[in-house]
């Protein structure tokens, strides 16, 4: 397996671990000290988080057959990070700040790493055009 494809695979497994663990925990814990509406949205998003983790695991296992799915997963994670940035700009950084920044940094970096590595893998594995006679 090419190194760049292995990088994508490791990123997918990392997303899978975070999504499966985080989604499961949030599904059971819910949103503490809140309204029914916010808890409902929180647990719904925990299901999306868990589902994305499972899809990422499958994509990592079947990485040699994946292309567009890698970009779509990267986009989803990037959009989640952007959502977190918007929240921080609108209502402030939750405490402890280091924890929330620890979530944000991978949400912004992993998608870029995944997309760049997938793009270079795709280019290297693309068949060469036929030679002119």
What are these model-derived regions, one by one?
Residues 108-133:
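Membrane-water interface at the C-terminal end of transmembrane alpha helices
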Residues 60, 82-102, 119:
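Membrane-helix boundary connector in multi-pass membrane proteins
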Residues 71-85:
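Hydrophobic alpha-helical membrane segments
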Residues 1-5, 61-67:
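Membrane-interface helix-boundary motifs at transmembrane edges
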Residues 17-25, 39-60, 75-79:
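Core segments of alpha-helical transmembrane spans in multipass integral membrane proteins
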Residues 24-32, 53-62, 83-90:
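Membrane-helix exit/interface motif
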Residues 35-42, 94-106:
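Non-cytosolic membrane-interface motifs at loop->transmembrane helix junctions
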Residues 1-16:
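Cytosolic juxtamembrane helix and N-cap/initiation of the first transmembrane helix
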């Amino acid at each position: 397996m090419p190194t760049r494809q292995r990088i994508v695979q490791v990123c997918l497994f990392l997303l899978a671990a975070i999504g499966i663990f985080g989604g499961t925990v949030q599904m059971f814990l819910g949103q503490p000290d809140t309204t029914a509406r916010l808890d409902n949205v929180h647990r719904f998003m925990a299901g999306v988080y868990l589902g994305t983790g499972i899809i990422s695991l499958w994509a990592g296992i079947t990485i040699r057959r994946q292309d567009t799915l890698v970009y779509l997963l990267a986009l989803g994670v990037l959009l989640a990070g952007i959502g977190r940035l918007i929240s921080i700009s609108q209502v402030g950084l939750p405490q402890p700040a280091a924890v929330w920044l620890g979530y944000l940094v991978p949400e912004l970096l992993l998608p870029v790493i995944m997309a760049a590595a997938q793009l270079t893998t795709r280019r290297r594995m693309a068949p060469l055009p036929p030679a002119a006679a």
